[in-house]
């Protein structure tokens, strides 16, 4: 469905729900609704013939639907994930099997800075030991010199959660920074940060404008992620 048609359908739904209570304004859409997502996750596995695959789970199963690229994901993230598949084969690293609990390599999480261009790669393993980790990191950085930090995250639990508690920084600072509405934010692997930077800036700007703040308000920034709304509004 074309993006403009999607907006029309959303507008109809919003009008239907809110018409009894208030007037509605026109939805503010994106100028370019492609490759905007700054957080990309891929689960790793293998086919019966041993071919390494990555993608997303089919709903309600542990069956991996292979994904090479997605129209809403940052192109750099998709390219990094594809190349990691090849590196696993080269380094003979086994992927994790959710059903049996055997294997090592589980997920990859890539976070990108919309304005800064910084790139974080998180390798999620079932064990704290990545074979030949120095050479693996060098090989990945050679393929993608745009990467600013690489993190090894350990998740050895049988869970649908992607990230575990323990992390080791393999390269870089262990975080990236990005700008949102003129403010610089530090983003870690586990930070809650809006995935669509362009629309987030439009949303926050409009919300703050409509709030009519005087500077005398006191804000309780509960459930705030990394505090973007409160900090920008202040």
Where are these regions (language model features)?
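Accessory RNA-recognition modules of RNA-modification enzymes
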Residues: 1-234
């Amino acid at each position: 469905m074309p993006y403009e048609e999607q907006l029309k359908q959303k507008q109809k739904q919003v009008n239907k729900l809110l018409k009894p209570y208030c007037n509605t304004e026109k939805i503010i859409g994106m100028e370019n609704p492609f490759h905007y997502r700054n957080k990309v996750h891929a689960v790793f596995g293998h086919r019966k013939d041993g071919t390494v695959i990555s993608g997303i789970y089919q709903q309600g199963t542990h069956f991996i639907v292979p994904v090479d690229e997605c129209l809403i994901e940052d192109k750099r993230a998709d390219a990094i994930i594809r190349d990691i598949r090849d590196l696993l084969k080269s380094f003979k690293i086994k992927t994790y099997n959710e059903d049996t609990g055997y294997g090592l390599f589980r997920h990859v999480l890539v976070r990108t800075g919309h304005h800064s261009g910084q790139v974080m790669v998180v390798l999620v393993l079932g064990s704290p030991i990545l074979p030949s980790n120095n050479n693996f990191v060098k090989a990945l950085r050679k393929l993608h010199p745009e990467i600013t930090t690489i993190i090894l995250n350990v998740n050895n639990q049988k869970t649908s959660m992607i990230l575990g508690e323990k992390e080791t920084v393999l390269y870089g600072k262990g975080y990236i920074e990005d700008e949102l509405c003129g403010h610089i934010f530090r983003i870690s692997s586990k930070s809650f940060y809006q995935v669509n930077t362009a629309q987030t800036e439009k949303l926050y700007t409009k919300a703050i404008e409509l709030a009519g703040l005087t500077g005398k308000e006191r804000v309780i920034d509960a459930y705030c992620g990394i505090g973007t709304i409160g900090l920008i509004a202040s």
